[in-house]
């Protein structure tokens, strides 16, 4: 991807994040068009004809080795934008910012370019779906058990 194209993509996300509440539907349309363009740019010479965005996301995700969580976030955006664009769901700023963060990190992975600071400051900081640390498993060392009687296999 060219630097100008990357900058333009980040600018689209920045504009979407700064959109007024009554224009969030338009912002979703712009973000969805951006995601489609990014996916198509990663498969220009493919003879594979993929008409739906879901297939293109999965293809590109496999090609650039996105984690399952990253793929799920892209598909979550796709489903949310479908609902908003088909007027089954009212667009919400929190979801729009979550989805802008998803696309920004996808673009960062595609281009190797850092997210501009002005955009990064607008994105949500804490999001349970972005936790990268593995879950901690604490081993139980001692346990107190109360029981009335026992047999060979169980405590009652």
Regions found by a protein language model. Name each.
Residues 1-156:
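Amphipathic alpha-helical interface elements
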């Amino acid at each position: 991807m060219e630097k100008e194209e990357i900058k333009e993509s980040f600018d689209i996300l920045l504009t979407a994040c700064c959109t007024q509440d009554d224009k969030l539907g338009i912002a979703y349309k712009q973000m969805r068009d951006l995601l489609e363009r990014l996916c198509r740019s990663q498969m220009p010479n493919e003879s594979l004809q993929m008409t739906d965005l879901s297939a293109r996301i999965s293809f590109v995700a496999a090609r650039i080795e996105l984690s399952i969580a990253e793929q799920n976030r892209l598909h979550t955006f796709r489903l949310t934008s479908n609902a908003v664009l088909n007027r089954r769901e009212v667009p919400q700023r929190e979801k729009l910012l979550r989805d802008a963060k998803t696309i920004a990190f996808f673009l960062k992975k595609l281009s190797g370019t850092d997210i501009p600071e002005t955009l990064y400051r607008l994105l949500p900081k804490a999001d349970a779906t972005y936790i990268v640390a593995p879950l901690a498993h604490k081993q139980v060392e001692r346990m107190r058990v109360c029981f009335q009687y026992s047999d060979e296999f169980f405590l009652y």
